[in-house]
Amino acid sequence: MRAIIETVFDIFYLVTVLTVGIRMICGSKAGTQFRLFGLMAVVLGAGDSFHLVPRALALCTTGLESYAVPLGLGKWITSVTMTVFYVLLYYVWRKRYQIEGQKNVTAAVYALSAVRIVLCMMPQNQWLTNHTPLAWGILRNVPFALLGLLIIVLFYRSAKQNNDKAFRWMWLTIVLSFGFYIPVVLWADVNPLIGMLMIPKTCAYVWTVLIGYNAMKAETGKQN
């Protein structure tokens, strides 16, 4: 039953995010915040598919243990695409609120992203095995969490200062995604049920994408 529920949920998630992303790309002008947001959604869905598709196959066939290599490779790819996702979200923030300058913030975003990706590439992660070291799981997620925190602060301040009702909860979607993700990193190997927190974490990302999509529909409608 768990395999069926999780597989159906993952398919729904991937189809939703990719469909919304493609619609945003097709329905927006080049160089706009919504074109960037659509690209961000496609990166999210495409990256997650490398992990979720093998996971669905594993759950519905011989089990996770038998799919160590494709699952590990999928997690590896997803760890990089999620970093790219937040870099794109940073540029959505810059475009939406017409931010100029802020070179120090941009440098911080790139520095944290670079450190995160370099750490993800280290062989000590043992991605292609069934047992990745907890210490490296924590280490590679420290710059990722700091990047997320930076994006949270930026959207919270800007949405409040600009009375941006469409994006007023963007910061919260990121808080929730990390709030559900961190316990999985720390304790999923000890208690596999904690891995179920990836479902509400995924829902938080769907909320993130829908915020952008709904804003595009509303703001495009006003222009027309």
Give, region by region, the residue ranges found by the protein language model:
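Internal transmembrane alpha-helix with an interfacial aromatic "cap," most often the third helix
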Residues: 21-27, 50-106, 120-122, 155, ...
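Terminal transmembrane helical module of multi-pass membrane proteins
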Residues: 171-217
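Alpha-helical transmembrane segments in multipass membrane proteins, preferentially the mid-helix core
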Residues: 17-26, 87-93, 118-123, 142-168, ...
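Hydrophobic transmembrane alpha-helical segments in integral membrane proteins
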Residues: 1-19
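Alpha-helical transmembrane segments of multi-pass integral membrane proteins
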Residues: 39-53, 74-91, 103-124, 139-151, ...
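Non-cytosolic membrane-interface motifs at loop->transmembrane helix junctions
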Residues: 3-6, 64-76, 129-142, 191-201
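A cytosolic-side transmembrane-helix exit/cap motif
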Residues: 56-61, 129, 156-160, 188-194, ...
